[in-house]
Each structure stands twice: as C-alpha cells, then as structure tokens.
UniProtKB/Swiss-Prot annotation:
Domain of life of the source: Bacteria
PANTHER family named among the record's database cross-references: SUGAR FERMENTATION STIMULATION PROTEIN A
Family membership noted in the UniProt record: Belongs to the SfsA family.
Record gene name: sfsA
Protein name from the UniProt record: Sugar fermentation stimulation protein homolog
Amino acid sequence: MKYTNIREGQFLSRPNRFIAKVEIDGKEEICHVKNTGRCRELLIPGVTVFLQEADFEHRKTKYDLIGVRKGNRLINMDSQVPNKVFREWLEKGYFQELQHIKQEQTFRNSRFDFYLEAGQRKIFVEVKGVTLEEEGVALFPDAPTERGVKHLRELSQAVAAGYEAYVVFIIQMKDIHYFTPNIKTHQAFGDSLIQAEKQGVKILALDCEVTEDSIEAGDFVTVKLVEG
C-alpha cells in the first residue's frame, strides 16, 4: 500500500487520543492521529514522525500522523492499514483456489474482517494490527480489549459450525523475533488466544516492510503463546 503527500515532522504532545501537536518545518501543527490506542512507547516528545498531508481543504486538521521512528525501526501506526495490507497479501495467493473475498461479514453476534471461499473451504478471518514492540518482540494488545476476546470466542464457534477460522496479526514493522500475546496488559486475551488455538482457530503473524510512504506484508513471524 502506498501513501502520497508524506511529510516528516517531530512529535511534541498528544492532547487527546485523536490529535497530536507536531512540528513541521519549524511550525507547530495539529494533526489527526490514525490510531486511538495509547502508543505511549511510540509517541515520545522529540521523535521523528511521518504525516500524510490531506487533500481535503475543509478538514479540521491538515495532516494525518501515520508513522514513527523508534530507534532504527520505522513503525506504521495507521490503524486503518492492517486490513488493506492483508487483502493485498491475500491476492498474492496464500489460499489456493481463492475465489471469493468479502469484507465485514457477520457471523452470529460478531462481524469478522473477512469471509473467504477457496475451493470447498469457507473461512472467517479476523485481522489485528500490532504496533507494540519490546526488545524485538511484537505484542498485542497494547490495552485491554474485550472486543478482541469476543472475536476469539466467536471464531471458535465458527470452527465448531464447520468453518475454518484464522486470526491474523499484522505487525506494522520489520525485524521482529516473534509475536506473543501481551498477558501483562490483558491476561484474558492471552488465555482466549490459547483456548481458540486448541479449538481449531489458526493463528498467523506477518511482519511488514515499512517505508515513509508505504507498507507491505513481509514474512511470517513465529507465534509463541507461552513466553519462553
């Protein structure tokens, strides 16, 4: 996926989860943050950030904050990107005989990100974007997510009903050793992920090639459900 009109700036502060103050070419600007998560380990005053200049004149903010440099690692933090990255990756042929892709498909009380048909296979997929990294380990979630727990339970129900089910973690950066659930932040999500795998839900993690103006799915990353 490619972006246009990218500008580099320095992060100053985040008054609330929707906006941030940044400096671009010596001028302070208010920008929209395309991730309502906490991102405290990323948005540190003075770090280099990447912003997309909006095409629409009537917006309240002129820029969208989409990426940040953390040490030598460039991290895309746009929460709208993972589904787009996954779809592009799908279309390169992971599922043989893929003939149908539908986004936002309802199953019982949940709406999953994707429903796929590949030959005789009927598949539900839930996609999660990952921006939290500690010492080369990718972690999800960065805040408690009861919605995430609900999705895992209902993916298990889909398996019991005869479907295939996947949860796919799109790690929005490169150079990751492995992925593991963030049990320090939300033990219930980690427990639910382990239980979902036991019940037949498949778990995939993919890292991404990230530049200032692009992001693309890269390689599979090892998933560790019990750290160590």
